[in-house]
Regions:
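CN hydrolase (nitrilase-like) catalytic-core segments centered on the catalytic cysteine
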Residues: 1-36
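ATP/NTP-dependent adenylation/nucleotidyl-transfer catalytic domains that generate, transfer
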Residues: 4-6, 44-119, 124-370
């Protein structure tokens, strides 16, 4: 029988399978415990085995005790469950895998509640929905931490999502803390221009707030970053990377949009507000910032990353698939430069054939990309 449950980064999907002598398959449910009773005709099994020459000389290494029950008035056909498992879509499997991985990680590590930052963006919206589905709305806490950079649109989307989910939320503005840190560091920074340093102060302030809530109440902090960001280093160490579990760590940004669409389809309503799908992705750490100011379009970025990470394509092989060479070189440079961040990130749930973590053992110091 196959195990169904989560263990750290791994999720075991169940689907125990019985194959009848005639090739008919009976498959148990996926991502949950199941119980099947199957009646196998041993005489029929022997006949099928004898038809295959390769099995005639098979020497059974394990002794099996057969118990044959004679049931009065038994029908001549074997008992089969009325309905066996039907294979689902990739998005459905991803949703159930992430829910199971999160639920078991929380339960098996002694947590009861989780907390996450709600920015009004797609990643935090999806994490919030998955957490509610896995743990129940009463066990999920959302924190909105606006600054002067945060748009009214983002605030509205975060509030609407929280109301749709029915989760308890806290609003903790970070503007005064941000100003205080800038004032504290100004004499040290002297006349150096404003840059990503000050932008990252905002992310790190939010990380401090979330970890403070975790320490005080014993809540597990959920990281909301994705595989596209972790691959390219488009995340702030000790900021939005702070937390105990990154459930989207192995999903590319393009996958996240598909999974989110599927969740709304399943619900029959816009649990994740439509505006979250329509607006341009942004970290909102400076005025007018958009992800594509620093990264290629996600459709291009994810295509390059998938070929390199999952398929082990070389730079030249990726270019041969139609990608611009300079873009590929840029993406692979980002990937290599960000190794030190990935080494310090929270564990995430593995849903691909090669995830960052146990599957990805690359050095920080030495070059590995030509």
């Amino acid at each position: 029988c196959n195990y169904a449950g989560g263990q750290d980064e791994l999720v075991f999907d169940g689907r125990s399978t019985a194959i009848m002598p005639d090739g008919h398959r009976i498959v148990a449910r996926s991502f949950e415990e199941d119980f099947l009773v199957i009646d196998i005709d041993t005489d029929q099994s022997t006949r099928y085995n004898l038809l295959e020459g390769k099995r005639k000389g098979y020497d059974r290494k394990v002794e099996v005790e057969e118990i044959n029950l004679k049931i009065p008035h038994r029908k001549s056909q074997e008992f089969l469950p009325e309905e066996t498992y039907k294979y689902s879509s990739e998005e459905d499997d991803l949703i159930r895998s992430l829910e199971l991985g999160l639920r078991d990680y929380v339960k098996k590590n002694g947590f009861k509640k989780v907390v996450l930052g709600l920015s009004g963006g797609m990643d935090s919206s999806l994490v919030a929905v998955l957490a509610v589905r896995a743990l129940g709305k009463e066990n999920v806490k959302g924190v909105m931490m606006p600054s002067r950079i945060t748009s009214d649109e983002s605030k509205k989307d975060a509030v609407e999502l929280a109301e749709n989910l029915g989760v308890e939320t806290f609003e903790i503005p970070i503007e005064s803390v941000f100003d205080s840190i800038n004032g504290l560091m100004r004499p040290v920074f002297s006349d150096r221009p404003h840059d990503v340093t000050e932008e990252n102060f905002q992310a790190r302030i939010r990380g401090i707030i979330l970890m403070g809530l975790s320490n005080k109440f014993g809540w597990l902090v959920l990281v909301t970053g994705n595989k596209s960001e972790m691959a390219t280093g488009y995340a702030t160490l000790y900021g939005d990377m702070a937390g105990g579990l990154a459930i989207l760590k192995d999903l590319y940004k393009t996958q996240i949009y598909r999974v989110a669409e599927r969740i709304n389809e399943q619900a029959g309503t816009e649990i994740i507000p439509r505006n979250v799908f329509l607006k341009a992705p942004t970290a909102e750490l400076r005025e007018g910032q958009r992800d594509q100011d620093s990264l290629p379009l996600y459709e291009i970025l994810d295509g390059i990353l998938r070929l390199y990470i999952e398929e082990s394509f070389s730079l030249d092989e990726i270019v041969s698939k139609g990608f611009d060479r300079k873009t590929v070189e840029y993406v692979l440079r980002l990937l290599q430069r960000s190794e030190y961040k990935r080494k310090q990130g929270a564990p995430g749930i593995k849903v691909s054939k090669r995830a960052f973590g146990k599957d990805w053992r690359m050095p920080i110091t030495n070059r590995y990309i030509d």
